[in-house]
């Protein structure tokens, strides 16, 4: 009504400009109406606009993040639904949706500005278009990550993508199409900055021919890599702290001293060094930084600095939830014993029909699980071959190749190189442990190609294994042959091998975090 009065006033004033007294009266009559109409516009207009903006944001917030499952537990829709099973819905959804919400708010605010100025022609002519704010490097990174999330989320509804090397298919994957899309997005944009500070042997070095070979293998591959490594930290998604706990135990720790402080101080000093020299650690409080360790003391070393243990991505062989391993942010990596530094002679084995032994294990009495296994099965059954020491002249690798199932109990720590050795040999792994998160569980459905047995069920081991039908065993065997490519060490690295699977797990953890400017 106020707008109609204003238009009427303009017409009357142009028609009767010669009558001064009448114009004066009309002016005095119209001023209050103009004031009232302006008051109404100011109070109603913004309130309606805000309501529209709030409605849009609310709608956006209902979209589930790409890596959070909405399916019931018995039928997960993983990569990334089952990927972080312990992640609270609120923490992940807030981080992911805030990105989409910020982007939608920018669009909506621009629409409101255009609508408001179009209602007033005279003021529109005097307004200059607003300059777009230049995004920072971090904001550009986060915007591209948001697009990657959307692409990955949509993958489950799309057709499989052709790939010249390998197309993930089958029940070995929680969601093969989502994993493949995520892997391709990683190849497209993932960048890692390796801090150059530090000298060998404690930094930029690691063992390549031992049970801890993943430390040295990863350091070598990432430092010689040209696809994922960047020399520009402003373009990096994550930052690698390239120290080796194995080397610290060898060169810093005083044997039998039980004094962990030299290792703790080395880690703490290194983080303080890069934190003082660069802005990136303090910007995220370590959330976009990662370490990799296969030593039993890796988890303990990570808590040398509180933010490293609590915030950073920790790629660990010793992935034990009872020792503060957190699947929502940490990465379980395989323990691989490369005695010669290569896979020569390690991969391969006969067909199922040429495997006469039902199950096999040989190993020392380490930790709480193995004594129970040996107590019930050592030298007591021809089908379940359990030995503390192998008989003279018997080959360990030949026993694995001649067995249908390979028993992989935890020792002092939950991880065991036997798991990968079983996969290499074409032997279905039997995992017996407590609190262990198997490698790449964010992507791989271990129950489809391995047998998981609780410590309490060790006495029933033969019953459990013989209850698996020949047809089901054959399916598991074939899946082992397919999935073992993800555990193979290659130099140079090959797509979908263990190096790239570790990178993918780190990539997924980075996708689940949003870093903001400080």
Swiss-Prot record:
Under the heading InterPro entries, the entry gives: Exostosin, Exostosin_GT47
A Pfam family matched in the record: Exostosin_GT47
Say which enzyme class the record assigns: transferase
For this entry, the protein name equals: Probable glycosyltransferase At5g03795
Give the function comment from the record: May be involved in cell wall biosynthesis.
Family stated for the protein in its record: Belongs to the glycosyltransferase 47 family.
Sites carrying a glycan are: 104, 113, 120, 282, 320
- Keyword list, A-Z: Cell wall biogenesis/degradation, Glycoprotein, Glycosyltransferase, Golgi apparatus, Membrane, Signal-anchor, Transferase, Transmembrane, Transmembrane helix
Q: Which PANTHER family match?
A: EXOSTOSIN HEPARAN SULFATE GLYCOSYLTRANSFERASE -RELATED, OS07G0188700 PROTEIN
The EC number of this protein is 2.4.-.-
| Cellular localization per UniProt | Golgi apparatus membrane
Q: Which GO terms describe its cellular component?
A: Golgi membrane
The regions listed as transmembrane in this protein's record are 26-46
Q: Where, in residue ranges, is this chain on the Lumenal side?
A: 47-518
Instruction: Determine the domain of life of the protein's source.
Output: Eukaryota
Question: What organism is recorded for this protein?
Answer: Arabidopsis thaliana
Q: Which residues lie on this side of the membrane: Cytoplasmic?
A: 1-25
Membrane topology classification: Single-pass type II membrane protein
């Amino acid at each position: 009504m106020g707008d109609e009065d204003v238009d009427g006033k303009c017409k009357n004033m142009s028609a009767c400009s010669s009558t001064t007294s009448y114009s004066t009266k009309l002016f005095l009559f119209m001023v209050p109406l103009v004031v009232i109409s302006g008051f109404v516009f100011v109070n109603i207009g913004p309130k309606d606009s805000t309501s529209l903006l709030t409605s849009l944001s609310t709608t956006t917030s209902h979209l589930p993040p790409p890596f959070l499952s909405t399916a019931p537990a018995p039928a997960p829709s993983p990569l990334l639904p089952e990927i972080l099973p312990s992640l609270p819905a609120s923490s992940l959804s807030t981080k992911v949706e805030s990105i989409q919400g910020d982007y939608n708010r920018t669009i909506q605010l621009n629409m409101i500005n255009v609508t408001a100025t179009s209602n007033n022609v005279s003021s529109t002519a005097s307004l200059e278009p607003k300059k777009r704010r230049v995004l920072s490097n971090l904001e550009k990174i986060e915007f591209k990550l948001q697009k990657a999330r959307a692409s990955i989320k949509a993958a489950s509804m799309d057709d499989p993508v052709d790939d010249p090397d390998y197309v993930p298919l089958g029940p070995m994957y929680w969601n093969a199409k989502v994993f493949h899309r995520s892997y391709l997005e990683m190849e497209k944009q993932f960048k890692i900055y390796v801090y150059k500070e530090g000298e060998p042997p404690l930094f930029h070095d690691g063992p390549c021919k031992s049970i801890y070979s993943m430390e040295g293998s990863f350091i070598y591959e990432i430092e010689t890599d040209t696809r994922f490594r960047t020399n520009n930290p402003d373009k990096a998604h994550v930052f690698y702290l390239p120290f080796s706990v194995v080397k610290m135990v060898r060169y810093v720790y005083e044997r039998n001293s039980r004094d962990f402080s030299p290792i703790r101080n080395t880690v703490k000093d290194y983080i303080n060094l890069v934190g003082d020299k660069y802005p990136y650690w303090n910007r995220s409080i370590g959330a976009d930084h990662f370490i990799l360790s296969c030593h039993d003391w890796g988890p303990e070393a990570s808590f040398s600095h509180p933010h490293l243990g609590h915030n950073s991505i920790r790629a660990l062989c010793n992935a034990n939830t009872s020792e503060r391993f957190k699947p929502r942010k940490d990465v379980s990596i395989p323990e691989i014993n490369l005695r010669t530094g290569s896979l020569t002679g390690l991969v391969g084995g006969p067909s199922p029909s040429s495997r006469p032994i039902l199950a096999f294990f040989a190993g020392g009495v380490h930790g709480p699980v193995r004594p129970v296994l040996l107590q019930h099965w050592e030298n007591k059954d021809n089908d379940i071959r359990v030995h503390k020491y192998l008989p003279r002249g018997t080959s360990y690798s030949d026993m694995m190749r001649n067995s249908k199932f390979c028993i992989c109990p935890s020792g002092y720590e939950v991880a065991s190189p036997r798991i990968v050795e079983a996969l290499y040999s074409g032997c279905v792994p039997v995992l017996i442990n407590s609190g262990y998160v198997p490698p790449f569980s964010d992507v791989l459905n271990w129950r489809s190609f391995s047998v998981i047995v609780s410590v309490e069920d060790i006495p029933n081991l033969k019953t459990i294994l013989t209850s698996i039908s020949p047809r089901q065993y054959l399916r598991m065997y074939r899946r082992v042959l397919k999935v073992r490519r993800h555990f193979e060490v290659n130099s140079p690295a090959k797509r979908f091998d263990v190096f790239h699977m570790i990178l993918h797990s780190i990539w997924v953890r980075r996708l689940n975090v949003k870093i903001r400017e400080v």
